[in-house]
Design a protein with these regions (language model features):
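Extracellular glycan-modifying ectodomains
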Residues: 1-226
Length: 226
C-alpha cells in the first residue's frame, strides 16, 4: 500500500521515531509538535530516552522532525498516561519519570493531570496539525496497556483505572466538540481490548498477546486503510 516504515534504526533522526512509544502523555505529544512546527523553546537536559541516555535538543533533529511531520497524511496519536512528572519551575512535563541520578526534589514534581488539561492538550494537538498540515487527518487512540507502577499513595490497579478514565473523558470531550469534523477520528483499541476480548494479555498482564494485536490491527485496516 506504499507505506513508509521507520523505526529506531531506519528513517530520519527524530525523537518521535526513536522514542515515540515512550511519549504516552498528551503534554509531550503537544510539546514535540510545538517544538517542530513553531520552534517552541524547550529547556535543554530535560528529554531522556532512558536513565543513561539523554535525548538531544538541537536544530538538526528539529528540522528532520519538521520535514517528517509535513509529509504525514494521517496522524495516529495514542495516549496512555495522565500521571506525569514535571518541572516545578516552568511546569514542563517530562516524557517519563526523572532518572534517579538527575532527580532534584526542589525542581521535580509528580502529579495526576486533569481532564481539563488533557482535553486542552488534545484540542491543541489537533489544531496545530491542521494549521501546518491542513490536508492531514488525525486518529486518536487510548492505549490499553495498564500502569506498571504509580507514585500515588494507592494501589496501581485503582490508579490505572483513574488514569485511563481521565484520558478517556478528555478524548470524549474533544470528539464531542468536533463531531462535525470529517478529519478527526477515535479508534476504540482500548474498548476492544477491555470489552471484547476475554483474555487478551500476556503473562505479564500488561502487553497484548500477538494474536489480539493482529486482530485489532485488522479492524483498524478495514476501517481506515481500504
Amino acid at each position: 500500500k506504499n507505506y513508509s516504515i521507520f523505526n529506531k534504526r531506519v528513517g530520519p533522526d527524530t525523537h518521535i521515531i526513536r522514542y515515540g512509544e515512550g511519549m504516552a502523555n498528551t503534554f509531550t505529544v503537544l510539546e514535540q509538535l510545538s517544538w517542530a512546527f513553531e520552534n517552541k523553546n524547550i529547556e535543554k537536559n530535560t528529554w531522556y530516552y532512558s536513565p543513561k541516555e539523554e535525548a538531544r535538543n538541537d536544530l538538526g533533529i528539529r528540522n528532520q522532525t519538521l520535514e517528517l511531520l509535513k509529509k504525514i497524511k494521517i496522524f495516529i496519536i495514542t495516549v496512555g498516561l495522565s500521571e506525569v512528572w514535571y518541572n516545578k519551575e516552568n511546569n514542563q512535563v517530562f516524557w517519563k519519570a526523572i532518572p534517579a541520578n538527575k532527580f532534584n526534589e526542589k525542581k521535580h514534581g509528580f502529579k495526576l493531570s486533569t481532564v481539563e488539561e488533557n482535553t486542552n492538550n488534545l484540542h491543541q494537538i489537533y489544531s496545530i496539525i491542521k494549521k501546518y498540515v491542513p490536508n492531514a487527518s488525525v486518529i486518536y487512540t487510548l492505549s490499553p496497556i495498564p500502569l506498571m507502577a504509580t507514585f500515588r499513595p494507592q494501589s496501581c490497579i485503582t490508579a490505572n483505572s483513574v488514569s485511563k478514565s481521565i484520558l478517556r473523558v478528555a478524548l470524549d470531550n474533544v470528539m464531542s466538540k468536533n463531531i462535525d469534523k470529517k478529519d478527526l477520528y477515535y479508534f476504540p483499541s482500548y474498548e476492544i481490548t477491555k470489552e471484547y476480548f476475554t483474555d487478551p494479555f500476556k503473562e505479564d498482564n500488561r502487553h497484548l498477546k500477538n494474536e489480539y494485536t493482529l486482530k485489532i490491527m485488522k479492524i483498524f485496516e478495514e476501517n481506515y486503510c481500504c
